[in-house]
Regions:
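Beta-hairpin (beta-strand-turn-beta-strand) motif
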Residues: 9-11, 195
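Mid-domain catalytic core of redox enzymes
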Residues: 127-213
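Short, small-residue-biased leader/transition segments that mark boundaries at the very start
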Residues: 2-7
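Active-site/ligand-binding neighborhood in enzyme catalytic cores
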Residues: 11-142, 146-153
Length: 213
């Protein structure tokens, strides 16, 4: 099942750089990145150039290129540079994606949280807002539309390109499948981007879902 033999930490940090290059200090990692980013001169013009300028070509080729092109269906040279700028790069051993002081996931997951928020609120399903716009707009002072923006404006500026996401759910007779909440598959050949094992999002639980002492 697993098309890989090596695991890297993400977002990119000292664990990533140690596994990729064998470096052990921030100074060594910074020097390695600086050596590889020299091929990019001037302001990066696309995602490939931006990625190389951030972390060097080795990490770009191994962990960014295939994954990104699989997600977007475009060559990295044809994608804008700003897409990759949001990805943290740290010369520390911090694995957190975000820098916020307080971070967390609702106990029981977001489904339970939303269910509690909707308690006592009318919910209508399978209703196309655009087909019933005049009626629905009278129900509130403000309406938040979350559908396709080009459809909202009746495609006056043309049709936007969209990338769809397909979710496949499997229940396995295993207490521990991959040992982590998310494992991303960064090669171009694997036909999926990641596998999620939801139980590991619940902090303070063991592999059987029991509370840790």
């Amino acid at each position: 099942l697993f098309p890989y033999t090596t695991l890297f930490r993400s977002p990119f940090n000292m664990y990533t750089f140690n596994k990729m290059w064998g470096v052990v200090t921030p100074e060594e990692a910074a020097a390695k990145i600086e050596e590889q980013r020299k091929e990019i001169t001037g302001e990066p013009q696309n995602l490939e150039e931006q990625a190389i300028s951030l972390v060097g070509r080795d990490i770009y080729e191994k962990l960014i290129k295939g994954y990104t092109e699989k997600q977007w269906g475009r060559d990295c040279k044809d994608l804008p540079s700003f897409i990759i700028k949001r990805l943290p790069v740290r010369l520390t051993f911090d694995n957190n994606y975000f820098n916020a002081l307080y971070q967390g996931i609702p106990v029981g997951g977001y489904t339970k949280m939303i269910a509690n928020l909707l308690d006592g609120i009318e919910v209508r399903l399978n209703i196309d807002y655009l087909e019933h716009k005049s009626e629905l707009d009278t129900l509130a002072d403000k309406v938040v539309y979350t559908g396709p923006i080009d459809a909202y404006f009746d495609y006056k500026l043309g049709t936007l390109e969209y990338r769809s996401v397909r979710f496949e759910t499997e229940t396995l007779d295993k207490s521990n499948f991959q040992g982590n909440a998310a494992v991303n598959y960064t090669d171009r050949e694997t036909p999926w981007t990641r596998i999620i094992e939801h139980k590991w999002f619940e902090f303070g639980k063991d592999e059987n879902g029991n509370d840790l002492p």
